[in-house]
Amino acid sequence: MDRFVSTYTMRLDAKGRVSIPAPFRTVLAKDGADGLYCHPSLAEPALDAGGNRLVGEIDALIESYPPYSEAREELAAALYGTSETLRIDPEGRVVLSDTLKAHAAITDQVAFVGLGHKFRIWEPERLKAHLAEATQRVRELRQAIGSRAENPRSTKA
């Protein structure tokens, strides 16, 4: 299965277009996506983006809640209601709307970060800060896991 991997920093051109990294375009093409599905991240000051696989995962998440339930309505509004399908031009560029750019504080550069089934679009300095925090949390998690592996709980009765 093809995945979005690696990080790429790209510059917006004078018309506000940005090129999707070629490896990401390849994954989108294999996914059969005819555009780029993009919405403000629910967790970060960034944008979540992807193709049909991402849309399918969102559909499954929303459909896991009972019809007309409050949770389903809120998820649908948060994910479908704020999403945009961006047209990819023949050169592999998209135009981010002002709403999307405002959510992620994007001005002249963006960083594309592969997350496997989707990718995230960040303002590069915000990404740098996020990665520093995430790396620290992963180190702490690794230490906690290592401590448990070294000192397994006793199984004696």
Swiss-Prot record:
Alphabetized UniProt keyword annotations: Cytoplasm, DNA-binding, Repeat, Transcription, Transcription regulation
Tagged with keyword Disulfide bond: no
UniProt subcellular location: Cytoplasm, Nucleoid
Entry keyword Glycoprotein: no
SUPFAM superfamilies: AbrB/MazE/MraZ-like
GO cellular component: cytoplasm; nucleoid
GO molecular function: DNA-binding transcription factor activity; transcription cis-regulatory region binding
CDD domains, alphabetized: MraZ_C (cd16321), MraZ_N (cd16320)
One Pfam match: MraZ
UniProt xrefs under PANTHER family: TRANSCRIPTIONAL REGULATOR MRAZ
Entry's family note: Belongs to the MraZ family.
Subunit structure: Forms oligomers.
Name the UniProt record assigns to this protein: Transcriptional regulator MraZ
